[in-house]
Every structure is written in structure tokens, then in C-alpha cells.
Amino acid sequence: MRKHSGEKKRGTLATKIILVVCAAVIVSNVFSIMFVLRGAQSQIRSSVKTTMMDMAESSDMLVENAMSTLNQDQLTYDAYAFLLKDVKIKNVDSSYVYLVNEDGTMLYHPTEEKVGQPVENVVVTGLVKQLQNGEHPGNAVVDYDFHGTAKYAAYCIMSNNDIVVVSAD
């Protein structure tokens, strides 16, 4: 009878060891996945911001070159639309480009009714104030809240102080 009791204890101890090892493996995997996901999210966010800045700078150059070629200080809505309407981040449907003059008035927006209206974006209104105070802020990518929606914006200040903005949710 004692022989059975010893085998039962050994079996119980082996089962406990296996359970502890399995639990340790599961916990280790969960932590590893959490760290990998956190790092991946950071990399994706960084990549999107870099892409947005590249798009803003490219849009700036497109508009500057068109104005220089046509020898004009500003273009028509149709000319801006021709240059900017298809500028979007691939697979990000909420992304678009708009253009604001140094007074904060929309020169181009995919929603044409917004053209001629004051810009509503707090980041851009802040840039307008800085420009009006004689400051020349550097190009940047920022995140902000717009009517309860988290958004990203990359902006470039053009040579005539117009502001090119790439926006995305």
C-alpha cells in the first residue's frame, strides 16, 4: 500500500511542476507579446509621421513650383485641386491635404465649401498667430483633438507663409 502512496505523491509533484512550467511559459509569452506590440505600435506611428511629413514637404514643393512656373502668388481652387486632391496616405481613408494662407483662411480643402472660411484646427490657428507675430515656426508633425477625434497633422510653412497641412485620423 505504501508503494501506491509514494507513486501518487510523485505523480502529484510532477503534475505541479508541469503546471508551474506551463504557467511560466504562458506568462512569459503574454509579456513578450505585449512588449512586441507596444514596440510595433511605436514603429508604425513613427513611420506614419515620417510619411506625413514627406507628403507635406512634397505638396509644398508642388505648389511652390506651380506658383513659380505660373509667376503667381496664389493659384485658383482648381489648380490647387489638380495638385493636391489625390495626396493621401495609402490605406488611410481619413487622410487629405489642405492649404491655409497666413491669415488663417482656407485656400484649398477637399471639401470645397470650406475654402474662404477660417481654419478651425487649433494647431494651424496657433501657427497663424506665430506667423502674424513675425515668428517662423519649423515644419513638424503633431497630434491633436478635433471635435473629439484624435488626429495627426504634418505641416510645412511655404516661402509666402501659406501653410500646407496633411491631416489624418
Regions found by a protein language model. Name each.
Residues I33, R38-Q41, N65-L70:
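N-terminal/domain-start segments enriched in small and hydrophobic, helix-friendly residues
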Residues M1-G11:
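Non-catalytic regulatory/interaction regions at protein termini and inter-domain linkers
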Residues M55, Y152-D169:
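Short, hydrophobic beta-strand elements of compact beta-sandwich sensory domains
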Residues V63-Q117:
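Extracytoplasmic/periplasmic helical hairpin
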Residues R10-G39:
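Extreme N-terminal signal-anchor transmembrane helix of membrane signaling/transducer proteins, especially
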